[in-house]
Amino acid sequence: MTALPAHLERVHMVGIGGAGMSGIARILLSRGGLVSGSDAKESRGVLALRARGAQVRIGHDADALDLLPGGPTVVVTTHAAIPKDNPELVEAARRGIPVILRPAVLASLMQGNRTFLVSGTHGKTSTTSMLVVALQHCGFDPSFAVGGELNEAGTNAHHGSGDVFVAEADESDGSLLQYDPNVIVVTNIEADHLDYFGSVEAYVKVFDDFVDKLRPGGLLIACLDDPGSADLAKRIVASGRSDIRVLGYGSADAQEVEAGTAFEPVDGVEVGVRLLGFHAHDVGGVLQFQLAGENAARTVRMAVPGRHMALNALAALLAARDAGAETEEIVEGLAGFGGVHRRFQFTGRERGVRVFDDYAHHPTEVRAVLGAAADLVRPEDDSSSTNSAAGRVIVVFQPHLYSRTAAFAVEFAQALDLADEVVVLDVYGAREEPMPGVSGALVAQSVTKPVHYQPDLSQAPKQVAALAHPGDIVITMGAGDVTMLGKQILDALRSAPHPAPR
């Protein structure tokens, strides 16, 4: 067992049930640390941590700092979700107990490992999870910390026996600059978290600064299909830094491969792998790709849908190869990847209607998920089939954060127009106070497809069941409690009268 730094031997975590915080707690417990924490409500994550020995209190008060014998050596929190006047943070300051952010703990836990960090505006959790599953299939036992629960492992974090540590690097508050990785994957870059950064330029710059943290001999893997990450790769190459490598991945067609141009450097950026095609199949898809230096394409059937997921898989492939894994075994591992909790997760099927759940809460994520859903009801290779003609995409969208809804209301509406029918719920405010004039109606009013604004969450399942017909796909979407509706929609479908033919 790897010894913990002295300051992490007794840790109190404010908001311990969150995806990122609970993962850190798991690793600390696995490495022999004592952990206490608090959270606003009971959850599956809290129950799992208690079962592993953590002392967790529901609600926040100063006495929570006495859950561990002798009190904590440090208090850990997150930048955005926990207010500064939280009584535990106030008490920690009174006692002189250091308060640090979650990324600082993760950086300490990574010391002595080869670190593989996945960053980008979207796709971090899925790509990180694919890399973990691929490495595990290849016989590695990596430590990992992921922002979602891997369906195969049933957990979001693990203390491994090997020297590889895989994690996603969250850019939302700039704290990813605390890491000094060996490998960085950047899936995409576009405006987000402007409430923190203040400008698009400042947001983009944090990725440049992050790449500057690469250790000598390190590797940047960047998606060339995305303008933001492609521009980052080109800037790094143009900067002349000679102690790191830059490797791109992205789409190409068969003609480019046959002409020998697919693997030519893009403004100096070396190309490692090309996606040649992706076709939807049931709840997954088949992707075709070719690696640089190989003369033939490879094909892999995946259990997760969407072209964006195919690109994520190629990023994971390049990273796993850099870790020393064999290509054939990596591909087998990716074929067995069953997805991540709340990332286009299959909830169930009732009366011919497939129900999925997704965490998408940014317009680009919404577009990617709805595009993948459209492929499932209207497959590229069977666009004339009866099934394809009948199937529709119905999205139940819950906007996340008042500030994000106000900033991107029109963009959300444009993305939601990729669905055939839209149900918009009210805003899930999370840490934010309501803003005048900002509600789900602000998004719904700009949707041009058939749209229903439903401010009452409890009424949504019956409403959706009445809209859905056999062959349709329903997606519950958002970063809030919309995820609870999936099972309720299936129940409503089960008990609803048989729908009349369209």
Swiss-Prot record:
The keyword Methyltransferase does not apply. It comes from the Bacteria. It catalyses: UDP-N-acetyl-alpha-D-muramate + L-alanine + ATP = UDP-N-acetyl-alpha-D-muramoyl-L-alanine + ADP + phosphate + H(+). Gene3D superfamilies: Mur ligase, C-terminal domain (3.90.190.20), Mur-like, catalytic domain (3.40.1190.10), NAD(P)-binding Rossmann-like Domain (3.40.50.720). It holds the Pfam family Mur_ligase. One of its GO terms (molecular function) is ATP binding. Signal peptide: none annotated. Its EC number is 6.3.2.8. Keywords: ATP-binding, Cell cycle, Cell division, Cell shape, Cell wall biogenesis/degradation, Cytoplasm, Ligase, Nucleotide-binding, Peptidoglycan synthesis. ATP binds at residues 120-126. InterPro entries: Mur-like_cat_sf, Mur_ligase_C, Mur_ligase_C_dom_sf, Mur_ligase_cen, Mur_ligase_N, MurCDEF_pg_biosynth, UDP-N-AcMur_Ala_ligase_MurC. GO terms for biological process: cell division; cell wall organization; peptidoglycan biosynthetic process; regulation of cell shape. It is found in: Cytoplasm. GO terms for cellular component: cytoplasm. Pathway: Cell wall biogenesis; peptidoglycan biosynthesis. The keyword Transcription regulation does not apply. Cell wall formation. Belongs to the MurCDEF family. This is UDP-N-acetylmuramate--L-alanine ligase.
